[in-house]
């Protein structure tokens, strides 16, 4: 037991479900809609991720469990260069966990608050990257419904990634949505008349993109709308406000923003082809955009943490249930919950048991590994396909 003794690295079974013990907690970096976010490192691969954790009891008490489950269901089916992708989801008795891409460039709201002045060419590339993400979501029948600077993260190179699918909706074909959801200053006009039966579709995300792009360029939004503004006032604002565009902006950018901020969803730009065919985008190599080969005009400062540093204090000092004390707390909780001391406690435990049973466990690493294993077999089957022979020399 001397200095020559070294700790053996933990052994991981690739078929085992990922759990909390597979990660090292490094630091807290932010708050999500229903939980908090910290930086973690996976012990076997040493890869860094962001881990969002949501307290089950709080989710039950706030009736938010279904939203979490829906977000998990949606994110498991998505993978794109300009999204924040889900890698793992798991649970313990206390929390639900989502492990996603780690993006340390901060969200666009943070940079706006730091008085960053985004140049037109920078915003132009942001728009290109975001419309590719929106096109992908549209093909997957997903409406995000909360596009705004707060939900757009930058990676260390300055590329944008859409996050937070908590109020996203899956849209069956030939249907529209009538429920109102979103952040009012970024919600499209048709969303405020949806209760009258008209409904809305994918075009609402493109309106939100227009509001966001305008705000990035000017530092304020095109319409004076707050979260506290009533729906009636918002409708009146849309009907009476004439959006102004600074003369310093190029006419091409102004024309594009007008297409995104078109009140009529049938005339609004809401397809990737709309933007790609727009004259302002003639100089864009879209393959290079997708492959992140175009250099953004704004690159986050690598020498600073691009988030509010108070999150670390809240987690480690002020938070009544800090994550780094989880193991000790769970052991005590298991002992305390062996008996129900009231009907209310028993009812809560029933709900928590239901969450435990219905939670969706996910491991993208395993999904990708299984997919790659199937590929050689698929290729072999195709070479044996007699229908593939056309009697011609197909070698090029």
From Swiss-Prot:
GO terms for cellular component: plasma membrane. It is found in: Cell membrane. InterPro entries: Kinase-like_dom_sf (IPR011009), Prot_kinase_dom (IPR000719), Protein_kinase_ATP_BS (IPR017441), Ser/Thr_kinase_AS (IPR008271). The keyword Magnesium applies. Keywords: ATP-binding, Cell membrane, Kinase, Lipoprotein, Magnesium, Membrane, Metal-binding, Myristate, Nucleotide-binding, Serine/threonine-protein kinase, Transferase. Residues 373-396 are annotated as: Disordered. It is a lipid-anchor. Its EC number is 2.7.11.1. A lipid is attached at residue 2 (N-myristoyl glycine). GO terms for biological process: intracellular signal transduction. SMART domains: S_TKc. It catalyses: L-seryl-[protein] + ATP = O-phospho-L-seryl-[protein] + ADP + H(+); L-threonyl-[protein] + ATP = O-phospho-L-threonyl-[protein] + ADP + H(+). Coiled coil: none annotated. Its cofactor is Mg(2+). ATP binds at residues 29-37, 52. Its main location: membrane. Residues 23-281 form the Protein kinase domain. It is an enzyme of class 2 (transferase). The keyword Membrane applies. The active site is at residue 146. Changing residue 89 to F: In a metastatic melanoma sample; somatic mutation. Belongs to the protein kinase superfamily. Ser/Thr protein kinase family. This is Serine/threonine-protein kinase 32A. The lineage of its organism: Eukaryota, Metazoa, Chordata, Craniata, Vertebrata.
